[in-house]
């Protein structure tokens, strides 16, 4: 049996209000519909009431106290925050880490500097004059190019490519298959062909950034492509050359940012949205899913649609578009009635 946690211990951890048996023990955490008696489960909002009513979990973290006597409840103001705190406490290391040191099959250039506490797993390549910081884990198949710098306490998952000269801060997480520092998309038409523009810049990633799986972050044409501290990027996102992403932004899956885009702090860009070349999105903005941003947005904007515009205006236009068939039919009826009236009027002259 794994480590057991009491309801009282978890209540103290999240600062909640306990309703039920403080000695109730849990050893795992599962969604309400999958949970068993030894599991903790979560109701992230009031819509989860029916799931909690029928769950077989022993303990549930809930936003309010519900009259369900079959389980112990820990009532908190922010269940999602409590879930993050509890899961980190119950599962401090959910993925097995490679041991410290350099695996015999890894290739580390003699001029590279790898901290003794770092782990360099099987088939990793670390290039000339590259640096890997303390307690950083490079999983199998990672490529670290020449003069690239990886900070301390980073997690670089399998088959990540960190091209020459890019710089990662501390506590950066890069998930499997992502490529940082590939060439930006730069070509000059010359009539019969497209001449490649050399991409001689770099990529700089701030502290506490997390990059999902299969993300591409292009190096700058000149200067740097930058993702600042605390920003979280979902899977399958493209960050173009010379983009500058602010602090603590959220960029959701399948977003595409063209070159030289600037995004302000704490902005959220939802799934499949696109931002046009050389566009600035201000701070604290919300770009809703599948939006197409074609012009600069001021701070605190909330936009949707293509081209992206104020969300309320977009909703009104969508509502109006849904009524177009009815409006067209009404116009046709009015036109026929006008024609009839014209005939009647002419007949009286």
Curated annotation (Swiss-Prot):
It catalyses: a UDP-3-O-[(3R)-3-hydroxyacyl]-alpha-D-glucosamine + a (3R)-hydroxyacyl-[ACP] = a UDP-2-N,3-O-bis[(3R)-3-hydroxyacyl]-alpha-D-glucosamine + holo-[ACP] + H(+). InterPro entries: Hexapep, LpxD, Trimer_LpxA-like_sf, UDP_GlcNAc_AcTrfase_non-rep. It comes from the Bacteria. GO terms for cellular component: carboxysome; membrane. Pfam families: Hexapep (PF00132), LpxD (PF04613). Belongs to the transferase hexapeptide repeat family. LpxD subfamily. Disulfide bonds: none annotated. Catalyzes the N-acylation of UDP-3-O-acylglucosamine using 3-hydroxyacyl-ACP as the acyl donor. Is involved in the biosynthesis of lipid A, a phosphorylated glycolipid that anchors the lipopolysaccharide to the outer membrane of the cell. This is UDP-3-O-acylglucosamine N-acyltransferase 1. Keywords: Acyltransferase, Lipid A biosynthesis, Lipid biosynthesis, Lipid metabolism, Repeat, Transferase. Homotrimer. One of its GO terms (biological process) is lipid A biosynthetic process. Its EC number is 2.3.1.191. Pathway: Bacterial outer membrane biogenesis; LPS lipid A biosynthesis. It is an enzyme of class 2 (transferase). GO terms for molecular function: N-acyltransferase activity; structural constituent of carboxysome shell.
């Amino acid at each position: 049996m794994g480590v057991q946690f009491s309801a009282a211990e978890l209540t103290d951890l999240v600062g909640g209000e306990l309703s039920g048996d403080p000695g109730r023990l849990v050893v795992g955490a599962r969604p309400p519909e999958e949970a068993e008696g030894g599991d903790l489960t979560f109701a992230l909002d009031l819509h989860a009431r029916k799931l909690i009513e029928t769950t077989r979990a022993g303990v549930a973290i809930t936003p309010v106290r519900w009259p369900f006597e079959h389980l112990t409840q820990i009532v908190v103001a922010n269940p999602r925050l409590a879930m993050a705190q509890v899961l980190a406490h119950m599962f401090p290391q959910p993925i097995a880490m490679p041991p410290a040191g350099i695996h015999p099959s890894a290739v580390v250039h003699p001029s590279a500097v790898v901290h003794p506490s770092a782990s360099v797993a099987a088939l990793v390549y670390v290039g000339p004059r590259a640096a890997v910081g303390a307690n950083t884990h490079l999983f199998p198949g990672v490529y670290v190019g020449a003069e690239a710098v990886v900070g301390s306490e980073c997690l670089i998952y399998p088959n990540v490519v960190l091209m020459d000269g890019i710089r990662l801060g501390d506590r950066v997480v890069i998930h499997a298959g992502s490529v940082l520092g590939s060439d930006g998309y730069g070509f000059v038409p010359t009539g019969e062909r497209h001449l490649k523009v050399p991409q001689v810049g770099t990529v700089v990633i701030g502290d506490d950034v997390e990059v999902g799986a299969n993300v591409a972050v292009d190096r700058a044409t000149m200067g740097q492509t930058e993702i600042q501290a605390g920003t979280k990027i979902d899977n399958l996102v493209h960050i173009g050359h010379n983009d500058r992403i602010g602090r603590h932004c959220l960029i959701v899956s399948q977003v595409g940012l063209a070159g030289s885009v600037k995004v302000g702090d704490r902005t959220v860009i939802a799934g499949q949205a696109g931002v046009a070349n050389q566009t600035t999105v201000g701070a604290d903005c919300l770009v809703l899913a599948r939006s197409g941003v074609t012009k600069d947005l001021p701070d605190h904007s909330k936009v949707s649609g293509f081209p992206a515009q104020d969300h309320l205006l977009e909703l009104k236009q969508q509502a109006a578009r849904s009524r177009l068939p009815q409006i067209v039919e009404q116009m046709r009826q009015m036109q026929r009635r006008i024609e009839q009236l014209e005939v009647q009027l002419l007949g009286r002259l």
